[in-house]
Amino acid sequence: MIRKILTTLLLLICPYIAAQESDVELPDFVITGKDIVNIGKTEKIPPDFISTISEIFLKPVFPTENLQMKEVNTPIKGSGALTDSLNYLTGSLNAGLGFYSLPKADLNFSSPFTNGIFEGFAAVDNTRAYVENSDRYLINGGASLSLYTDDDASFLPGTQFKFNGEYNTSAFKFFASDNPSFKRILNNGNAYFGMDNLMGKYFIFSAKLSDDNLDLKNESFTENIFDISGFAQLTLPAFDLGVEANYKKQILTNDYMSGNKINFLSTRPTMGISLSPLVNITLGFNYQHSDSNNFFSPYAFMSIYFSKELSLYGEYSPQAEFWGGGHFLQSNDYFIAERFSNIFFKKNTAFSAALKYEYYTYVEINGGIKYYKSDNQPYFFDTTAGMFDLATIEAKSYTAFVNLLFHPGPGGIFYATAEANNTKDNNGNTVPYFPAAKVTFNYGYNFTNNLETETNLTYLSGIHTAINSENTLRPYINLGVKLGYQLFPDFYLTFKISNLINHNNYIWQGYKELPMDLTAGLNYRW
């Protein structure tokens, strides 16, 4: 089946590809946030290197809370200077008070040096109650150290190393439950080490090690996830050989077990072939194992460059994933994690395709489709009001998406995403809490040198609340505006309005989101 699909696709596109230019290059600069950092020209990463059509590949990492602060990525080339931009910022301090934010502050700083950069952040966000017992707070902080070697270094040339640590604590109440004053305190810490070298002509690799610990204070849930992952790719004259691997170890304490240990192993060996300078295919298999669960499936990926601007990607990748309680707590604060251990989530069939248009580093438009079928699709349901458990069901999921990315230019900066989703079980029931439509956009523009503006929108609709019910939450509409006015060098007066139209928003049944809120503050940059 896969061979027929690939053959048909090749017959359709090969005559067109043969007429195109074969040289595909990156420009001499990369836009990272507000400013431009010159890092020296590098070779374009071949399309077969991107072996999965992922969220990271297609969507930007967009710091909406900190537009003015430049996100500095460690240069790959040793000749790149981290501070070669005239407007380079090494720090930003924001502090503000609002109708419900009392107080809100965040600090970001960086200290670049030869062959590296040290970065840190800290934040506090205290929200007072807008309905009874809806008050909450968040405190977090972290630091990272990035190091890289020169391309001509005698030891591991062109290699990057990153050390990172982060800790946060948050507290909130189950204000839509039968016990509205019940307070959850969630503590989460993470330590990370990574190294990679993507500049090798014949061999590239990446390895990451992390340890994530999550604890619910005064609740019987503690989870530690130790995670090792990596990939390597060897380029030979006729083909490429690659392998991706991931090992996880969960140590869990909950209502039913204490210190229970579960292992998860995933691997994907592949072989890539270039059918032409612009057409690449990768074949292999996925294998996952955990306890008594095993999953095996063939894997196929194809990438095509029609031109410098236009490329097509397709992937067939059934696989299994290992998710613990911490994964679901990231999605739903009100998940009763102490009754859950983990899930070996299987996508028995899965494929995706995306078409991507790029104009240098200024404009990117991509869109496509995703499909998967699972015999144990997890979903949230409330056993009692305001408290959510997990169940699984056999389901199919169809998604169409488009992403619009207009990076900083004369017209400002604009990022937008739109997604339509249809996830249903075998009886045609919509799986709860899978929005049928999602739209987000952020637009920033500086009207003058002293006035910065940003408009953002989040829209969700078609959120069902039960598997056998047509009851849906009302559409979620959160329109926001941010203004920054320069009082004098390095100091800005800031205003932020969230939920501008004061819409009654809900993401989870019964839990009303923040109403219109105005926050005013100061921003100091250095």
Where are these regions (language model features)?
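Outer-membrane beta-barrel translocator/receptor signature
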Residues: 74-77, 84-141, 159
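Exposed, low-structure sequence patches enriched in small/polar residues
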Residues: 93, 123, 284-289, 293-297, ...
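Outer-membrane beta-barrel transmembrane domain signature of Gram-negative proteins
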Residues: 183-192, 208-279
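Flexible loop and strand-edge segments within Gram-negative outer membrane beta-barrel domains
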Residues: 127-142, 152-201, 212-225
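Short sequence motifs at beta-strands and strand-loop junctions characteristic
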Residues: 97-101, 133-137, 155, 181-187, ...
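Short loop/turn motifs that connect adjacent beta-strands in outer-membrane beta-barrel proteins
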Residues: 82-89, 114-116, 150-160, 197-203, ...
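N-terminal periplasmic/intermembrane-space "pro-region" immediately following the signal or transit peptide
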Residues: 19-83
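Surface-exposed extracellular loop regions of Gram-negative outer-membrane beta-barrel proteins
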Residues: 110-127, 242-248, 255-288, 409-411, ...
